C-alpha cells in the first residue's frame, strides 16, 4: 500500500478527511498523520503541537497499513 492507495481506501471506507493528514501540508493538529522523515515513515497523532503517539516504520507499505488499521478501528468505536 502507498499514500495514494491509502487515500482511496480511507475514502471508500468513509473515513472523514478531517481525521487524517497524508501530505504533511496544511492542518495536522488533532488528526493522525503520516510523513517520511530521514528515510523512515512516521505515523503520529498531533495534539496541541505535541506528538502524543508516534510509530516509526521502514516502509511506506507498513506505515500505510498501520494507519489504515488505526483509523478503521477508531471509526468502529
Name each region found by the language model.
Residues 4, 58-74:
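A short, charged, amphipathic alpha-helix used as a generic interaction element across diverse proteins
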Residues 53-57:
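A short, polar/proline- and glycine-enriched secondary-structure boundary/capping micro-motif
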